Structures are given as structure tokens and as C-alpha cells.
Swiss-Prot record:
GO terms for molecular function: RNA binding; rRNA binding; structural constituent of ribosome. SUPFAM superfamilies: Nucleic acid-binding proteins (SSF50249), Translation proteins SH3-like domain (SSF50104). Keywords: Ribonucleoprotein, Ribosomal protein, RNA-binding, rRNA-binding. Pfam families: Ribosomal_L2, Ribosomal_L2_C. GO terms for cellular component: cytosolic large ribosomal subunit. InterPro entries: NA-bd_OB-fold (IPR012340), Rib_uL2_dom2 (IPR014722), Ribosomal_uL2 (IPR002171), Ribosomal_uL2_C (IPR022669), Ribosomal_uL2_CS (IPR022671), Ribosomal_uL2_dom3 (IPR014726), Ribosomal_uL2_RNA-bd_dom (IPR022666), Translation_prot_SH3-like_sf (IPR008991). It comes from the Eukaryota. The keyword Lyase does not apply. This is Large ribosomal subunit protein uL2. The gene is RPL2. GO terms for biological process: cytoplasmic translation. Gene3D superfamilies: 2.30.30.30, Nucleic acid-binding proteins (2.40.50.140), Ribosomal protein L2, domain 3 (4.10.950.10). Belongs to the universal ribosomal protein uL2 family.
Length: 254
């Protein structure tokens, strides 16, 4: 009988869980409150910090608590153009400036926004990685819905009350620069998770992987595997709808 293969061990967690010791904490929008729903609230960017394992910088923004005599520090994903000392306005009546947080129903069509909520109040779910953004395509005031275009090119309909941050997430073009050497990849994954270096299945022995063994490195059978296969067989192209090169132009579904 073969060994427990790598993806079975990953499912158990343990050494494969993400490395969070140096993280700055969850980057979310403000909790949706009366001030944001009916007017606006002002905060100031205190500092812009690096978050280990994340491609985009984070902005520490301080707001006055609308209900208590205290200050609240929020951690936002920094947009391109945001700087320390900048005022950030959040709410329905906020101005249309980079870094401000508005409901999608309050921004004109064609506006570029990021860290967009899927449901009002979930504090940001879409277009959160460096250089990403969402484009507002159109509004339907009767149903209180807004149509947006995601970074993947897919279109999505969300509530017009869902909030977004005006502008593009900072750190764009990060993946265009090659790592060039193994040492940089080592440091990259050291703060992310234990997923590097990755030994190929065909380079293993038959006990270690379904693709292992043979007098030369070849898979020896179809690399596609069914969704219902047992976990020890699940290696390769799992439940692939199609394989091979994509030919012709790619069309996104409207």
C-alpha cells in the first residue's frame, strides 16, 4: 500500500497552515453604522505599513467613535495615491476621491473601486489584492442593484448598498517582476505558507504519488481524475472540464 500523499497531508493542516506571526491583522472596512448609511464620517491616515505575506500595503486610519468619546483605529488595504495625513471620508455623502469609501449606488458608472463588499456590511470581499480593481458598469435603482466587472472579467450583480473604496489597490505590477532566484522564492513563501519547494509527482517513487515510478519520468496514464476519486488518487487535473491549450480569443460571459 502506498503512503499518504502530499495533498492528503495538506488537508490535515498542521505544518501546511498559513504563517501569521508577522501579520498586521484583518484588513476590513468600518462596521456599517448610522453615520455611514445617512451621512459620512472622517478619518485620518496615521501610517502605511507592510503586511507580511500580502502584496499590498495596509493603511492605519483613525476615526472618532460616533457613540463614545474615544478613537478607533481601522486597518484598510491602501489604495494607490493614499498617503499619511490624508483625510478619508466614509459614507453615503462622501466625496468621490481616491481612498474614500462609498456605497456603489452613490458612484457614477465607469468608476474604479476596490475592496468591494459582496453583501452590505461584510466589510470588503472583492478586488483586494495588489493592483486589482472593480469597474462599476451600471445601476438599477428600481431593484437597488449595481452591475460590476470583476478583475477576472466576469460580471456580477451586487446590492447598491455594498460599499467600495475609490481607486486601485496599491502595489500593482508586483507579479511582473520575476523572482529570478530561489532565495527570493524562499523568503516569499516563508511568510505565506509551507508550499515551496514543490517536488513533482513524476519525480517521486510509486509509493509517494500516483504519478511516481518508471524508467523515465512520465505520468503513464491520463492525468485527469474524477471528482469522486478517493483522496489518495487525487493528483493531477482534478475534475477537469477540458485540458490542453486554450485556442482562439477568450470571451467573458455577459
Amino acid at each position: 500500500m502506498g503512503r499518504v500523499i502530499r495533498n492528503q497531508r495538506k488537508g490535515a493542516g498542521s505544518i501546511f497552515t498559513s504563517h501569521t506571526r508577522l501579520r498586521q491583522g484583518a484588513a476590513k472596512l468600518r462596521t456599517l453604522d448610522y453615520a455611514e448609511r445617512h451621512g459620512y464620517i472622517r478619518g485620518v491616515v496615521k501610517q502605511i505599513v507592510h503586511d507580511a505575506g500580502r502584496g499590498a500595503p495596509l493603511a492605519k486610519v483613525v476615526f472618532r467613535d460616533p457613540y463614545k468619546y474615544k478613537l478607533r483605529e481601522e486597518t484598510f488595504i491602501a489604495n494607490e495615491g493614499v498617503h499619511t495625513g490624508q483625510f478619508i471620508y466614509a459614507g453615503k455623502n462622501a466625496s468621490l476621491n481616491v481612498g474614500n469609501i462609498l456605497p456603489l449606488g452613490s458612484v457614477p458608472e465607469g468608476t474604479i473601486v476596490s475592496n468591494v463588499e459582496e453583501r452590505p456590511g461584510d466589510r470588503g470581499a472583492l478586488a483586494r489584492t495588489s493592483g486589482n480593481y472593480v469597474i462599476v458598469i451600471g445601476h438599477n435603482p428600481d431593484e437597488n442593484k449595481t452591475r460590476i466587472r470583476l478583475p477576472s472579467g466576469a460580471k456580477k450583480i451586487v446590492s447598491s448598498d455594498a460599499r467600495g473604496v475609490i481607486g486601485v489597490i496599491a502595489g500593482g505590477g508586483r507579479v511582473d517582476k520575476p523572482l529570478l532566484k530561489a532565495g527570493r522564492a524562499f523568503h516569499k513563501y516563508k511568510v505565506k505558507r509551507n508550499s515551496w519547494p514543490k517536488t513533482r509527482g513524476v519525480a517521486m517513487n510509486p509509493v509517494d504519488h500516483p504519478h511516481g515510478g518508471g524508467n523515465h519520468q512520465h505520468i503513464g496514464k491520463a492525468s485527469t481524475i474524477s471528482r469522486g476519486a478517493v483522496s489518495g488518487q487525487k493528483a493531477g487535473l482534478i475534475a477537469a472540464r477540458r485540458t490542453g491549450l486554450l485556442r482562439g480569443s477568450q470571451k467573458t460571459q455577459d
